[in-house]
Amino acid sequence: MSNYSVSLVGPAPWGFRLQGGKDFNMPLTISSLKDGGKASQAHVRIGDVVLSIDGISAQGMTHLEAQNKIKACTGSLNMTLQRASAAAKSEPVSVQKGEPKEVVKPVPITSPAVSKVTSTTNMAYNKAPRPFGSVSSPKVTSIPSPSSAFTPAHAATSSHASPTPVAAATPLHLSASGLHVSANLSADQCSSPPNTGKPAVNVPRQPTVTSVCSESAQELAEGQRRGSQGDIKQQNGPPRKHIVERNTEFYHIPTHSDASKKRLIEDTEDWRPRTGTTQSRSFRILAQITGTEHLTESENDNTKKANSTQEPSQQPASSGASPLSASEGPESPGSSRPSVAGLRSAAAFKPVGSTSVKSPSWQRPNQAAPSTGRISNNARSSGTGASVGPPQPSDQDTLVQRAEHIPAGKRTPMCAHCNQVIRGPFLVALGKSWHPEEFNCAHCKNTMAYIGFVEEKGALYCELCYEKFFAPECGRCQRKILGEVINALKQTWHVSCFVCVACGKPIRNNVFHLEDGEPYCETDYYALFGTICRGCEFPIEAGDMFLEALGYTWHDTCFVCSVCCESLEGQTFFSKKDKPLCKKHAHSVNF
């Protein structure tokens, strides 16, 4: 941003006009300049945004506050501004670098030359599962999806014919616990973009004999070879119908209808994004063949336990977290290894500036905090214990309150937050009882057990959040007001800041008068500038009828005879020792 500072030598006028402010929901900007004025000579331009006035940020100022702040600068005016050209530029939109969703459309089959890749003999790769069947349609299309449940035929071939066996197909490993998939595919990432750089190639499969291949896996591979052979080559094989399950023996009933259309409808169900760890049909068949279908229940339980102890913030990758790779997700069916996705998901989705683990901050300092595993979205962390609260505000009429700690055993109240019975020590605030761990700020979620809080609009906020978002600013000291607020002259004031100029006492809610823009209490104003009635010794206020006689000023109703109290307004009167008398008592009364 192109920020610059200007210093205009006083006195006013400064040669510019302002527009905007917090009350107009727009930043303070320069609306017009006077030709040859001080602002114009300092190279200030129309449209420049005012960032600070005399060292005080103008971001939260209203239009009137900014005007008063500029008026208060008599000697010199220092401002920090931002050029209009830099302020008008929109910030670049951050594009999420996630994996785009796959567009399902038919792809014609081509057969280019395939480069051979040598592989070591100790690789435990097996063919990916695919349905049984035969060719039935003259025109077939393929739906390439390397990470889907139905792996393409060219990606599941043996190591002698696959150019990229690791990236194109999901390898299967045979271990002591059975057949499982090595890559943990996330449920939301089952659809990955097709590899358009390498067209699908259907190569007739050759039987692969390894030391770890079981008889069931060989039968599955044999069925896959039968399904991949036909008059016309296709990638995902012919359409399939129902699968009858009888003691792990499967009978496939092929159909000879519109295979291309029905294949597109049925097969897309397997690689559509799912929630949780739902298995596709091919994986369920494979799990029953290898005898690992019962391992899924224990895996789901472990995954749920791992996920229940963590609450990652569901924010996009543009907030600072790197996009998840294919290995970060729920464990694939048939695997006996514990999934690491539940342990890594919180770190992968953690936004910038968030803390890792937040311990219960309602505990006293130097006390061991139990491990909870809750993820805090707040930038402030209480560490191992609650930090010592700020000192009590100096305002006597402060709005900040503190909760009262009640030990356990006296009574069992109901918590105002969760409406549950409290067993153990609790807090009392605003006439209600709270669990210590649930008495938190409504904004930052920090505990308020040992710090002050303020009630605002039915919610409870800590001192810091209330000062930041709700507390008004004093018109004299420019500080936040946490106590009693005085509203006068279209501004807010501390009680100790809105005082009489003459006596220095707080005016509070009493009557005051302005003289040359300065407030005076009623007593000092009339003593310095007002007129006192000679008769009642009360001030003659604006609008009162008065008259002047005997060198003094009187209310029209106070200028009466000192003996009979008859009004002497407009009548002949006499005076003895500066006391007015009527004709009747002028010669009969001696003072």
Curated annotation (Swiss-Prot):
Biased composition (Basic and acidic residues): 258-273, 294-304
Sites bearing N6-succinyllysine, chain numbering: 89
Gene Ontology CC annotation, any one: cell projection
Cell compartments where the protein resides: Postsynaptic density; Presynapse; Postsynapse; Cytoplasm, Cytosol
Record PTM N-acetylserine, positions in chain: 2
Domain of life according to the entry: Eukaryota
Crosslink feature (Glycyl lysine isopeptide (Lys-Gly) (interchain with G-Cter in SUMO2)) location: 89
Ranges for domain PDZ: 2-85
Bias (Low complexity): 144-166, 310-339
Keywords tagged on the record: Acetylation, Cell projection, Cytoplasm, Isopeptide bond, LIM domain, Metal-binding, Phosphoprotein, Repeat, Synapse, Ubl conjugation, Zinc
PROSITE patterns in the record: LIM_DOMAIN_1, LIM_DOMAIN_2, PDZ
Pfam families, alphabetized: LIM (PF00412), PDZ (PF00595)
Main localization, broad class: other
UniProt-listed Gene3D superfamilies: 2.30.42.10, Cysteine Rich Protein
Molecular function as annotated in GO: metal ion binding
Self-association and partners: Interacts with various PKC isoforms through the LIM domains. Interacts with actin and alpha-actinin through the PDZ domain. Interacts (via LIM domains) with SIPA1L1/SPAR; this interaction may occur preferentially with isoform 1.
Function, in words: May play an important role in the heart development by scaffolding PKC to the Z-disk region. May play a role in the regulation of cardiomyocyte expansion. Isoforms lacking the LIM domains may negatively modulate the scaffolding activity of isoform 1. Overexpression promotes the development of heart hypertrophy. Contributes to the regulation of dendritic spine morphogenesis in neurons. May be required to restrain postsynaptic growth of excitatory synapses. Isoform 1, but not isoform 2, expression favors spine thinning and elongation.
Protein name: PDZ and LIM domain protein 5
Species of origin: Mus musculus
